[in-house]
Swiss-Prot record:
Residues 480-506 form a coiled coil. It is found in: Endoplasmic reticulum membrane. The keyword Coiled coil applies. This is Protein sey1. HAMAP family: Sey1. GO terms for cellular component: endoplasmic reticulum membrane. The lineage of its organism: Eukaryota, Fungi, Dikarya, Ascomycota, Pezizomycotina.
Length: 864
């Protein structure tokens, strides 16, 4: 490749060797190369941040600009052949300093890092002729991007206007003022470094400096200045340095030595406040001062340069602050996207897992979430700050706030999901733990303190929730305050504790109600069984006074009240361990009294069913009819007053029917004070407390029943029907008694004994006269009596039956043996067997003495 013009297509590969001669930034057709960022990346300039420097070179065409850059920076820009005079550099080219890191005699004097050199197309070339548009645009581009502008000028051109590129420098001054007008808050300062070529030393360098500075002052005075800048000086915007180089062809060794010496000037330096360019004092130190840098990060330079050139080539007013903001906007967006990709890799798995748990309705506390949230947020902010803080501060701060907002929005959602999961799982675990502890206490039978269990589990639940919250929050963020969530959690724990307490009290009430039901079932049942005991019948108590039948309901009511009072004491004592409020205890006792009345009424209705009541009435009647006042059973005789006893017993029993038909106390002849005993509905009772309670007449006004109606046990129709049925049953008992009395009159007639004596007189005398008969009769009588007293008649009879059976079997066996031993018998057996084979065969079962098939048990009995 001989000339730079051939390099316009370079930069499409990722091979670093493709950029050996640099990269064409802008071609001769004013097109910007989009591969600048790729070149900077291959040269490892992109991550440098602000640690890079940009130099541009100006000068007339064919004055050795590319040659100068190649010697200064080791670049490989193509140079003009000595045998012809034509344009070599087309457009603007850029290359990185190749001498970076070279050893020097003085280690402190080394070239700056990441120096980028732009070789600008020469001016006053015949190829463009009168077209100076590109010259102006390239000058504006170089001034907007470069820190140092090298003006390549020959010694003999100093003092000339065209030859010394005074027109180009005038353009540079005008462009600089244009940039200043767009950004009055910042003075865009640059260094104009005049490299005087073919310097022979006849004219001292200071004189050349003076001439050039006079020309610069004249040029500055000649340009039109905006209002307020009329008195400004060129030194307000530019610094100047000068250097003379020997002739390359005539003094090649000196030229190489001086260019090497000059290259060491391209290092970072500091302004010397003691020097004043107006007095002709110019620094010979490092050329890269901090104020020259355009403060465009290396990773955004390509985008920034493209935006600058786009405005220049479209003849728009160049607005560097706007371009910097646009660049900052673009780069911050890119950095934000890159940062969010890394953030997503860390956070998305947790978001997906949390979302899946929410869909399944199975809240799960995610382990490691807090550490991942803190780490990913810190990395995202730090990485963004590292890459984006070099750009426009306003844009950076705005985009950082946007990044933090995006990150915090998602992290806040994760935190809320984590706290919700901890909330729900904590509530479930709390309920299960309380229930498990209660069941364990019930199984052990040692008792348990429900309030203590709840308090302990509440402390554990809150501690666990706070552990999850503290391990998940991100310190330093406003959304990491979980006090509200903790308050809601504590409130629901209190609600659940109250619900569990109410459920436990409800279970306690159920246990007490079952105890009341059992006690009332026994006690009231005994009272009903004692009906009629006033006559000392079957239901009478063994000792003590006989209860009066008319006080039956008094006894039932007293038993009921005492039982319920005992149950209330049990309920109150147990409820105290639940930490229940007085209102809850009042509601529980009120429900207990209502439920207990329902139990009593159900027991009464059970005892007062038609069948049970009729049986009780009959027993009461029979106690009075069949037994006397001393409780001795009556043996009816024809002389007894059966009708009178029957009438008194029946009428006495009939008085029980109206007594039992209505629940009334004997003392007051009025229903018991059920309404006062139950009491009014507590103000703290909820509809749920009342929904399972049956209405009670005289207590619940909406029921529409009075207390008298509530105490009605038997209706009038039932009473009449019961009376009729009882009378029929009593009549049956009376008829039976009558028959018994009449049956007792039957006896053997007296003449029968006389007839027996007359007919059996001879036999009686024979027995009495014969001692043997008499003794035998006496022995048999004594033996029979002894056998009866010893209860041996059964075994004797069984032994007799067994002996007779055995004798029968033995007789059959002997008969068969006898028949088989004689000829006649054998013929008979043969005939019997033949007839049996020719006809049907039947199997005969061995029967017991009762005519049933004999079993193994019968055989065992036979063996006995």
């Amino acid at each position: 490749m001989a000339t730079n013009g051939h390099f316009a297509t370079i930069g499409v590969d990722n091979d670093k060797t493709a950029y050996e001669h640099g990269v064409q930034v802008i071609d001769e057709n004013k097109e910007f190369n989009p591969n600048i960022s790729k070149y900077l990346s291959l040269e490892n300039v992109t991550p440098a941040g602000f640690n890079y420097h940009l130099i541009s070179v100006f000068g007339s065409q064919s004055t050795g600009k590319s040659t100068l850059l190649n010697h200064l920076f080791g670049t490989h820009f193509s140079v003009m052949s000595d045998s012809e005079r034509r344009q070599t550099t087309k457009g603007i080219w850029m290359s990185k300093n190749k001498k970076e890191g070279e050893a020097t005699v003085d280690p402190t004097l080394r070239m700056a890092d990441n120096i980028l050199v732009m070789d600008v197309e020469g001016t006053d070339g015949r190829e463009r002729g009168e077209d100076q548009d590109f010259e102006r645009k390239s000058a504006l581009f170089a001034l907007a991007t470069s820190e140092v502008l090298i003006v390549n000028i020959w010694e003999h051109q100093v003092g000339l206007y065209q030859g010394a590129n005074m027109g180009l420098l005038k353009t540079v001054f005008e462009v600089n003022l244009q940039l200043f007008l767009k950004d009055k808050n910042t003075t865009h300062r640059s260094l104009l470094f005049f490299v005087i070529r073919d310097f022979v030393g006849a004219t001292p360098l200071k004189n050349l400096q003076k001439t050039l500075m006079e020309d610069m002052a004249r040029l500055w005075e000649s340009i039109s200045k905006p209002p307020g800048l009329e008195s400004s000086s060129v030194h307000d915007y530019f610094d100047f340095q000068f250097y003379g180089l020997p002739h390359k062809s005539y003094q090649p060794e000196q030229f190489v030595a001086e260019t090497k010496k000059l290259s060491l000037r391209f290092r970072e330096g500091q302004r010397d406040p003691s020097m004043d360019a107006r007095r002709g004092e110019f620094s010979e130190g490092g050329v890269f001062l901090p104020e020259y840098h355009r403060r465009i990060p290396a990773d955004g330079f390509s985008r920034y340069a493209e935006g600058i050139w786009d405005q220049i080539v479209n003849n728009k007013d160049l607005d560097l602050p706007t371009q910097q903001e646009l660049l900052a906007q673009f780069r911050c967006d890119e950095i934000l996207r890159e940062v969010m990709i890394a953030f997503d890799e860390a956070i998305v798995p947790f978001e997906e897992k949390q979302s899946q748990s929410a869909r399944l309705g199975e809240p799960e506390v995610l382990g490691g979430l807090g550490a991942a949230m803190r780490s990913s947020r810190a990395k995202a902010v730090k990485n963004f700050e590292t890459e984006a803080s070099r750009y426009h501060k306003g844009v950076y701060q705005r985009k950082r706030a946007e990044l933090e907002s995006k990150v915090d929005t998602r992290l806040k959602a994760l935190l809320q999901g984590q706290l919700n999961a901890a909330h729900k799982s904590g509530i479930n675990e709390f309920s299960e733990a309380v229930s498990s502890s209660v069941k364990s206490g019930q199984k052990q039978g040692t008792g348990y303190d429900f309030a203590e269990i709840v308090n302990e589990e509440v402390k554990k639940a809150i501690a666990k929730f706070e552990d999850v919250a503290r391990s998940t929050v991100v310190e330093g963020t406003t959304w990491s305050d979980y006090k509200q969530e903790l308050a809601l959690y504590e409130k629901e724990l209190a609600d659940v504790s109250g619900r569990l307490r109410r459920e436990e009290m409800r279970r306690l009430a159920n246990r007490v109600e079952r105890w009341v039901q059992s006690r009332l079932g026994e006690s009231v049942g005994l009272e009903f069984n004692a009906l009629g005991s006033g006559r000392a019948g079957g239901g009478a108590p063994e000792t003590g006074e006989k209860p009066l039948e008319k006080a039956f309901w008094d006894r039932v009511w007293n038993v009921f009240v005492e039982t319920v009072l005992d149950a209330e004491r049990r309920f109150t004592d147990r409820a105290s361990s639940f930490d229940a409020s007085l209102e809850e205890v009042d509601v529980g006792l009120w429900r207990l009294r209502r439920k207990s009345w329902g139990v009593l009424r159900a027991k009464i209705d059970e005892e007062m069913t038609e069948g049970n009541l009729l049986l009780k009435l009959r027993e009461n009647f029979e106690d009075k009819f069949r037994y006397d006042d001393a409780g001795v059973p009556r043996i009816w005789r024809p002389t007894d007053d059966i009708e009178g006893i029957y009438t008194r017993a029946r009428e006495s029993t009939l008085t029980l029917i109206p007594l039992l038909s209505r629940f009334r106390l004997a003392e007051t002849s009025a229903p018991p004070p059920l309404d006062r005993w139950i009491g009014h509905t507590p103000s703290s009772a909820t509809p749920a407390d009342e929904e399972d309670l049956p209405p009670i007449g005289g207590v619940d006004e909406e029921e529409g029943k009075s207390l008298d109606e509530e105490m009605m046990i038997l209706s009038e129709a039932k009473r009449q029907e019961l009376t009729v049925r009882f009378k029929k049953a009593a009549d049956g008992v009376y008829v039976e008694a009558k028959r018994s009395a009449i049956g007792g009159m039957t006896q053997v007639p007296l003449y029968f004994y006389g007839l027996l004596l007359a007919l059996g007189w001879n036999e009686i005398i024979a027995v009495l006269r014969n001692p043997a008969y008499f003794f035998l009769l006496f022995v048999c009588a004594v033996g029979a009596y002894v056998t009866y007293q010893l209860n041996l008649w059964g075994p004797i009879i069984k032994m007799t039956e067994a002996a007779s059976s055995q004798a029968l079997v033995e007789g059959k066996k002997r008969l068969r043996e006898f028949l088989e031993s004689s000829d006649t018998g054998r013929q008979a057996i043969a005939m019997s067997a033949g007839s049996g084979r020719s006809g049907e065969q039947y199997e005969l079962s061995d029967l017991s003495k009762k005519g049933k098939a004999r079993t193994s048990a019968d055989e065992d009995m036979d063996d006995l």
